[in-house]
Design a protein with these regions (language model features):
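Acidic/His- and Gly-rich active-site-bordering loop/insert found
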Residues: 1-59, 82
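A short beta-alpha structural unit
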Residues: 19-20, 187-194, 209, 238-259, ...
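Acidic-glycine-rich active-site phosphate/pyrophosphate-binding loop
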Residues: 39-53, 119, 134-145, 297
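His/Asp/Glu-rich mid-to-C-terminal helical/loop segments that flank catalytic regions of hydrolases
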Residues: 79-83, 164-165, 172-176, 216-217, ...
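Acidic-enriched catalytic cores of C-N bond-cleaving enzymes acting on peptides and small amides
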Residues: 156-192, 199, 214-240
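Zn-dependent metallopeptidase/amidohydrolase metal-coordination segment
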Residues: 191, 275-313
């Protein structure tokens, strides 16, 4: 905010989600677009964020997803305010939050709630130039907790272990065979529990997700999850499950418009980098506008790799 104001940009707003919003030439009706980049990363606050240069590359956790794109968006705002004449289309430039991890696209949801009925287009700047994401991947996310009696590893041997029960549950969940023509995946992402090496665990928790480009496939995956949990519950094994995130799949949207603009972006990227990006699908801030029928595109402005790793560049 301070940097933007130092460039002479006076109107810098924020909302209850802490999105930072810079309106420019906003028009009535749906004669407006939105360009956004997210500020959050997957890394904890304890992660060392020291930028290091290695073989001509800038390396730092979170630098490509999505800090560098956000920095370029700052320069784009400065350029537009200084060089571009106002025209018939307005723009909201946004630095949003909640894109990563369990953020559940909170920033994008709030933006679409506030401005969605006035938008004809949304672009999210995220990741790298070698891909353009023209469609969305939805997801369901859950926190699952298994509880058992537990006890001493020797004296109470034979008592149910929450860790062992969770392992058996995961094994069964990984036996699921997705149905439908779409691409569906599932993942046990985080597991925690137990007390010590000589304790039969009383509690074990897991973060689990399912992803698909088809809404029906997500529902089928969820049904299998709930059926499996019900089957594994006994008097000695308690299982709790809470849905903690839901990213919608694509709604009814003008795909021809999306592909037309994607082709133009692809031509420009190839002209600058010499490499033509591939079209694909992903879970991004665009999930929310696409679910609402607003044509949207996710595109990267940088070259890089290693997203979500400590070696990111």
């Amino acid at each position: 905010v301070e940097w933007l104001q130092a460039q002479g940009i006076e109107e810098v707003l924020s909302d209850e989600c802490t999105n930072v919003i810079v309106p420019w030439n906003i028009q009535s009706g749906k004669n407006n677009c939105m360009f956004m980049a997210h500020l959050d990363t997957v890394f904890s606050e304890e992660t060392e964020l020291m930028i290091k240069e290695k073989k001509g590359k800038w390396c730092c956790p979170g630098i490509g997803d999505d800090t560098a794109n956000a920095a370029i968006l700052l320069l784009l705002i400065k350029y537009v305010h200084e060089k571009v004449k106002k025209r018939s289309c307005g723009v909201w430039f946004v630095f949003d939050v909640g894109e990563e991890g369990l953020g559940n696209l909170a920033g994008s949801r709030k933006l679409m709630e506030s401005y969605g009925n006035r938008l004809r287009w949304v672009t999210s700047f995220d990741l790298y130039t070698h891909h353009i994401y023209t469609s969305s991947v939805g997801s369901y996310r859950y926190r699952i907790v298994v509880k058992t009696k537990g006890g001493h590893s020797y004296l109470d041997f034979g008592n149910k272990s929450a860790v062992a029960e969770m392992a058996a549950l995961i094994h069964e969940l990984y036996g699921y065979q997705p149905v439908g023509a779409g691409h569906t995946t599932y993942n046990a992402g985080v597991i925690s529990g137990g007390t010590s090496v000589n304790t039969i665990a009383q509690e074990c928790s897991m973060l689990y997700e399912a992803r698909s480009d088809e809404a029906e496939a997500l529902v089928e995956c969820e049904n299998y999850l709930y059926e499996t949990l019900k089957k594994r519950k006994t008097d000695d094994v308690q299982i709790e499950c809470k849905k903690i995130g839901e990213r919608p799949c694509m709604g009814v949207v003008d795909t021809e418009k999306i592909m037309r603009i994607a082709q133009k972006c692809s031509d420009l990227i190839e002209k600058v980098t010499g490499k033509r990006p591939a079209f694909g699908q992903a879970s991004t801030d665009c999930n929310i506008p696409l679910a609402m029928g607003i044509p949207s595109l996710c595109i990267g402005l940088i070259e890089g790799a290693g997203a979500h790793t400590l070696e990111e560049w």
